């Protein structure tokens, strides 16, 4: 599809067909489109609004172009779209250690920051984790720690063609929405945070279209792409072929309604400090938001568990020291694996 005709169609707010979307995404991901053309496409899609069919088609292309990794099942991913502009610490990354410590295998798909002050990869590298691991090393992490981090550029090399356009735009784009949909381990259960409640049903439907068994898509009424401690959060749950909408408030689970001020960060260093504080057992707003979002993943991953029980499992995983142990064990393991591969 020629860029000129694509842009005219989007300017007139006409949706793209699945075939058109696949063609355009392929052009963006193979170097056929220039940075200016990619940026124009992304900006016009944002103005028009991405549809279920467009996102499903785009995710299918991205999955086809990805370097896939088979880590077995069941697995869960906990991920946010970003783009909420709130600059909270890396809650989903913190939750990954808690959920793994609760005995659930986590394949955490993440990247460096594009639209926030601290992406999951920025934080982990600050802490000393090695992210560029081979498939067998990633499997080793899952086997020993129940958790592996899948560094997006390694699994989605085609994304390099859109990196400059995204960074120059500096705004939330289609790719924020796609990131949670293209986990290279092809997880079947996911907790996905989105930056606006307007996107809940759309993303849940796309996940269902892509073969998800169970998902929780979450957005808070104060604009976080996760369960908030400062407002009610809305959930669209997909399970057994059905969609269900429900709400979560911290007070419903014995947690304090708190301002977000205490969990806003300016850097990966600050985010790391908060995460280590939570995993060490410190109380406060950071712990509470990690408990709520970890519970969402435990609830999504386990059959027949209530949200109350899931919060208790998250609390135990922190208070018995296992979440902190997981953090330190995985960090050391990635460093050891990296040294071994460098000596081969």
Swiss-Prot record:
Q: Where does Mg(2+) 1 bind?
A: 92, 226
Q: Where does Mg(2+) 2 bind?
A: 225-226
What is the free-text note on the cofactor?
A: Binds 2 magnesium ions per monomer.
Query: Which co-factors does it depend on?
Result: Mg(2+)
Q: What is its EC number?
A: 2.4.2.18
| Record key words, sorted | Amino-acid biosynthesis, Aromatic amino acid biosynthesis, Glycosyltransferase, Magnesium, Metal-binding, Transferase, Tryptophan biosynthesis
Give a Gene Ontology cellular component term annotated to this protein.
cytosol
UniProt xrefs under Gene3D superfamilies: Nucleoside phosphorylase/phosphoribosyltransferase catalytic domain, Transferase, Pyrimidine Nucleoside Phosphorylase, Chain C
Q: Residues that bind anthranilate 2, according to the entry?
A: 166
Q: Part of which pathway?
A: Amino-acid biosynthesis; L-tryptophan biosynthesis; L-tryptophan from chorismate: step 2/5
User: Quick one: which residues bind anthranilate 1?
Assistant: 80, 111
Task: Give the catalysed reaction(s), semicolon-separated.
Answer: N-(5-phospho-beta-D-ribosyl)anthranilate + diphosphate = 5-phospho-alpha-D-ribose 1-diphosphate + anthranilate
Q: Which residues bind 5-phospho-alpha-D-ribose 1-diphosphate?
A: 80, 83-84, 88, 90-93, 108-116, 120
Q: InterPro entries attached here?
A: Anthranilate_Pribosyl_Tfrase (IPR005940), Glycosyl_Trfase_fam3 (IPR000312), Glycosyl_Trfase_fam3_N_dom (IPR017459), Glycosyl_Trfase_fam3_N_dom_sf (IPR036320), Nuc_phospho_transferase (IPR035902)
Report the top EC class in one word.
Answer: transferase
Q: Which GO terms describe its molecular function?
A: anthranilate phosphoribosyltransferase activity; magnesium ion binding
Q: One short Pfam family name for this protein?
A: Glycos_transf_3
Q: Alphabetically, which GO biological process terms does the record hold?
A: L-tryptophan biosynthetic process
Subunit annotation: Homodimer.
Role summary: Catalyzes the transfer of the phosphoribosyl group of 5-phosphorylribose-1-pyrophosphate (PRPP) to anthranilate to yield N-(5'-phosphoribosyl)-anthranilate (PRA).
Q: What NCBIfam families does this protein's entry cite?
A: trpD
* Similarity-based family: Belongs to the anthranilate phosphoribosyltransferase family.
Q: What is this protein called?
A: Anthranilate phosphoribosyltransferase
């Amino acid at each position: 599809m020629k860029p000129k005709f694509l842009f005219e169609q989007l300017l007139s707010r006409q949706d793209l067909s699945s075939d058109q979307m696949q063609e355009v995404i392929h052009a963006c991901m193979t170097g056929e489109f220039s940075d200016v053309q990619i940026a124009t496409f992304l900006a016009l899609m944002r103005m028009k609004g991405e549809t279920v069919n467009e996102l499903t088609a785009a995710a299918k292309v991205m999955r086809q172009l990805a370097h896939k990794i088979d880590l077995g099942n069941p697995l869960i991913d906990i991920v946010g779209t970003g783009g909420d502009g709130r600059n909270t610490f890396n809650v989903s990354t913190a939750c990954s250690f808690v959920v793994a410590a609760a005995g659930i295998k986590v394949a955490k798909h993440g990247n460096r920051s594009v639209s926030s002050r601290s992406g999951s990869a920025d934080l982990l590298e600050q802490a000393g984790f090695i992210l560029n691991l081979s498939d067998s090393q990633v499997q080793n992490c899952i086997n020993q720690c129940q958790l592996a981090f899948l560094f997006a550029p390694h699994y989605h090399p085609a994304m390099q063609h859109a990196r400059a356009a995204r960074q120059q735009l500096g705004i939330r784009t289609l790719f924020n929405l796609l990131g949670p949909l293209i986990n290279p381990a092809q997880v079947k259960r996911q907790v996905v945070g989105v930056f606006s409640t307007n996107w809940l049903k759309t993303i849940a439907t796309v996940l269902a279209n892509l073969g998800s068994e169970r998902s929780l898509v979450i957005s808070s009424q104060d604009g976080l792409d996760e369960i908030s401690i400062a407002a009610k959060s809305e959930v669209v749950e997909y399970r057994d072929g059905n969609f269900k909408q429900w709400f979560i408030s911290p007070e419903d689970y014995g947690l304090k309604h708190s301002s977000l001020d205490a969990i806003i960060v300016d850097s990966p260093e600050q985010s790391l400090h908060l995460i280590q504080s939570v995993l060490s057992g410190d109380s406060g707003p950071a712990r509470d938001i990690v408990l709520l979002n970890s519970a969402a993943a435990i609830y999504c991953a386990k059959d027949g568990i209530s949200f109350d029980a899931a919060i208790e499992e998250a609390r135990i995983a922190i208070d018995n020291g296992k979440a902190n142990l997981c953090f330190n064990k995985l960090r050391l393991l990635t460093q050891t694996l990296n040294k071994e591969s460098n000596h081969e």
